[in-house]
């Protein structure tokens, strides 16, 4: 269970870093938003899912 928690936490940190760097770059580029809107929404959805997964796994560990 600890391995699953650590993997989910690492994935959350990695997706957070990618979104923090990637979203401003996408918004600053010309026509970037219209071309990559689905990728941004998919990343945000994955981030929200991982927040819940980390919270649930944390309740089993702590």
From Swiss-Prot:
Glycosyltransferase found in the keyword field: no
Transmembrane segments: 8-28, 41-61
Keyword Transmembrane included in the entry's annotation: yes
Official protein name in the record: Photosystem II reaction center protein Z
Gene (UniProt): psbZ
Domain of life the protein comes from: Eukaryota
PANTHER family: PHOTOSYSTEM II REACTION CENTER PROTEIN Z
GO CC annotation terms, alphabetical: chloroplast thylakoid membrane; photosystem II reaction center
Lineage: Eukaryota, Viridiplantae, Streptophyta, Charophyceae, Charales
Alphabetized UniProt keyword annotations: Chloroplast, Membrane, Photosynthesis, Photosystem II, Plastid, Reaction center, Thylakoid, Transmembrane, Transmembrane helix
Function field: May control the interaction of photosystem II (PSII) cores with the light-harvesting antenna, regulates electron flow through the 2 photosystem reaction centers. PSII is a light-driven water plastoquinone oxidoreductase, using light energy to abstract electrons from H(2)O, generating a proton gradient subsequently used for ATP formation.
Assembly: PSII is composed of 1 copy each of membrane proteins PsbA, PsbB, PsbC, PsbD, PsbE, PsbF, PsbH, PsbI, PsbJ, PsbK, PsbL, PsbM, PsbT, PsbY, PsbZ, Psb30/Ycf12, at least 3 peripheral proteins of the oxygen-evolving complex and a large number of cofactors. It forms dimeric complexes.
One annotated GO biological process: photosynthesis
Subcellular location: Plastid, Chloroplast thylakoid membrane
UniProt topology in membrane: Multi-pass membrane protein
Family of this protein: Belongs to the PsbZ family.
Gene3D superfamilies given in the database record: Photosystem II PsbZ, reaction centre (1.10.287.740)
Xref: Pfam families: Ycf9
